[in-house]
Amino acid sequence: MLTLLNTFAELPEAYKAFAPTVDVLPLIPLFFFLLVFVWQAAVGFK
């Protein structure tokens, strides 16, 4: 079962060059979430 999931988790050969970018993509929404707090701190949590 784990090998089946691992097979689906691997990028196709044509996209192997983008693997580092794909690893970072899930973190982008977290940066926006943190940006909200920084922005609100800058304007005083109004």
UniProtKB/Swiss-Prot annotation:
Q: How does it sit in the membrane?
A: Single-pass membrane protein
Q: Which domain of life is it from?
A: Bacteria
**Cited InterPro entries:** PSII_PsbK, PSII_PsbK_sf
The membrane spanning regions, by residue number, are 25-45
GO BP annotations listed: photosynthesis
Pfam families for this protein? PsbK (PF02533)
| Prosequence residues removed at maturation | 1-9
> Where does the protein end up?
Cellular thylakoid membrane
**Gene Ontology cellular component list:** photosystem II reaction center; plasma membrane-derived thylakoid membrane
Which keywords has UniProt assigned to this entry?
A: Membrane, Photosynthesis, Photosystem II, Reaction center, Thylakoid, Transmembrane, Transmembrane helix
Q: What does UniProt give as the signal peptide span?
A: none
The UniProt similarity line reads: Belongs to the PsbK family.
| HAMAP family linked | PSII_PsbK
By its UniProt entry, which PANTHER family does this protein fall under? PHOTOSYSTEM II REACTION CENTER PROTEIN K, PTHR35325
Question: Function, please?
Answer: One of the components of the core complex of photosystem II (PSII). PSII is a light-driven water:plastoquinone oxidoreductase that uses light energy to abstract electrons from H(2)O, generating O(2) and a proton gradient subsequently used for ATP formation. It consists of a core antenna complex that captures photons, and an electron transfer chain that converts photonic excitation into a charge separation.
Q: How does it assemble?
A: PSII is composed of 1 copy each of membrane proteins PsbA, PsbB, PsbC, PsbD, PsbE, PsbF, PsbH, PsbI, PsbJ, PsbK, PsbL, PsbM, PsbT, PsbX, PsbY, Psb30/Ycf12, peripheral proteins PsbO, CyanoQ (PsbQ), PsbU, PsbV and a large number of cofactors. It forms dimeric complexes.
Indicate what this protein is called per its UniProt record: Photosystem II reaction center protein K
The gene designation is psbK
